[in-house]
Amino acid sequence: TSPKRYRKETSYVYSCGWPPVFLGDLNYYLEDYDLTTVAGEIDTNRVGVHILSAEYDCSGTAELGQAAHQAIAGSTFQEMKNVGHFPMSENPKAFLEYLLPTLDRIAAA
């Protein structure tokens, strides 16, 4: 699990957002936008797509990440264990364990 101090800080920072803005964010990514309609058009020869989905992300689940990966030919996918929606701030050390190898693969390509 993520260190408590990072979880608390992340929760505090996120809760400081103006509530109507947050509601707009939720509406956009839960209702308005559907990647599945255009995912197959993404050309990974022109732009790399590397999907890192968090085990404890309730809005962007690992299942949704896997589905996006399957819809985007040439993409990569990895489920990040023991982190949530904000892995970079809630557990930076754990996040780097997933991010750095991904960046290494990009640099080697």
Predicted stretch roles:
Residues 1, 33, 103-107:
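A general structural signal marking secondary-structure boundaries and capping sites
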Residues 72-109:
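Catalytic active-site module of serine/aspartate enzymes centered on a nucleophile-bearing elbow/loop
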Residues 2-70, 76-79:
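Conserved serine/cysteine hydrolase catalytic core
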